[in-house]
């Protein structure tokens, strides 16, 4: 919905219906360049999927605002300690397990806006209370993210 382009990148509004079960995915090769910025969100949502999610050929994530692969996986382990994670130089596997813990989680962002936004969205699915160590980092790319998230989720 509302498709457009900015800086040669496609943009659109996405509406998510959480009534259906998420399924694990494999993403690699020529699909990665077009999804590189979305991989942190795909990784966090993989915690709620049925089956394994595999991301490969995404080595460039090691050289963004943070080492996004390592930071994403360490925060996933905090969010759900039961999740099985395999970390590779160019990606990861996430094999989710049921998480019955409702304990609050502090998410370390290292100033990375995509990590902060991804875990805020994941917290809506799990209804887990999370603390983002640096919410202001989101202003880099999406200054009204928290305002819109609150509005959309009501």
Model-predicted regions and their roles:
Residues 1-154:
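Short, structured segments at the rim of ligand-binding sites
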